[in-house]
Amino acid sequence: MDADANSNNDEPNEDADSETVVRRDRFSGGPAREFLSSLTGDSRIFAADLAVDRAHVVMLAEQGIIGDDVAGEILAALDAIDSAGHSDLPDGEDVHEAIESAVIDRVGPDGGKMHTARSRNDEVATCIRYRLREDLLEAAETTLALRESLLEAAAEHTETVMAGYTHLQPAQPTTVGHYLASYAAAVGRDTARLLDAYDRTNASPLGGAAFAGTPFDIDRERTAELLGFDRVVDNAMDAASARDFLAEATAGLAIHATTLSGLAEDIVVFANKGYVDLSDDYSSTSSIMPQKKNPDT
């Protein structure tokens, strides 16, 4: 929506094909709008946007900014949109505009009140953080499961002697348990990094509006509570503009991928040396040399 989050309660416009659109400008139709639209890629934050919309509407009603009857109609429309799915949304510049258009289609002009006291700036930032929290927790859970498996295997091989390598050459004797525990330690640090990123992601930007807040008597702590955030992002400009949490999450995942790459490469080397026998489920063969077992996976 426009940066002015407080002036969108007018009746929606109709385009040349009588399709409800939230706003009209030089990008309202044609190839420019199609090129600029992120609606398809926004499917990843469809559920997040609906959650943010619901929390915002509930807060607006609790604060007396919109009526309970209007809030109920909007929430019912959001439920219907949720059931219909992302693929049923009308065309839009992004999922946020498309959902608002769909609400207005169902509710009428009052549906636009859903966006009262809110900018697309803080809305988008909140949706991204909401979805990223799920992704980070899922990634952290996989690291915990991997670390547990490594430690269980290490405990079974505390006295299983193996050659330790440097420069791909046998260097010193060690044990399989010692080797596996080294990766368990690295994975543990990966988990900690992901959880640190989660902590900095888990703050609500909602209510920051375009970048300087809103004169409406909103309750930012209430929407943060409804969305499961630990706290709000204090500075409204930082709330709308910050994206460092994305870089931090990406870095944590990249470091974990490096840990996994090292473990996978070790297994490839051990397979070549005949120390381990990879399952056929994780191997391929050659089109001309069927005796080969290639560790491609």
Where are these regions (language model features)?
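Internal glycine-rich alpha/beta core junctions
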Residues: 98-101, 105-109, 113, 175-297
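A helix-coil-helix interface module used to build multimeric assemblies
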Residues: 2-4, 10-182, 188-191
